[in-house]
Amino acid sequence: LMERYDFMIEIFNKKINSTEYILNDFIYCSPDKDYDQFCKNNKSNEKRRSLGLFYTNLMLEKIVDSDKIFEMIQDVQKDLFIKIKQDDSSNIVDEMSELLYIMITNGVSILKTNKIIWSDINERVLTISKMKHKSEPSISNKTIFKHMDILLFIDKLQ
């Protein structure tokens, strides 16, 4: 579509630049506290995961530059390292881990070609995978195992 209709390029560029907000806007609400908000959060999480996968697939098709995906992944990783040190953020950290899993495992074939940035991303995944439950206020077994899954996926490709 973008090759056929020039106006689509501008629309796409605006959309991908505004996506950074949704990829970094993680919130959590307990279903016991506010079930409607909990349901909205679930929809927002699904949208975020879908967008992450969509942009990763666009990178694979060479429509989105890999630098943009690197930036998105690194931003989420940086936020994750901040959130694990905060109290009562384990659900948010779990969701960040899920997004990272989707983007990294689906884009690894291109992502690992930039050895310097890939090394940084991989090192952060390794660091989380080696953490112990409760070593940080908001680290959960789910997050630790999700990062182990990322490493396992990468190892299987080599």
Predicted regions span which residues?
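Alpha-helical interaction scaffolds
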Residues: L1-Q158
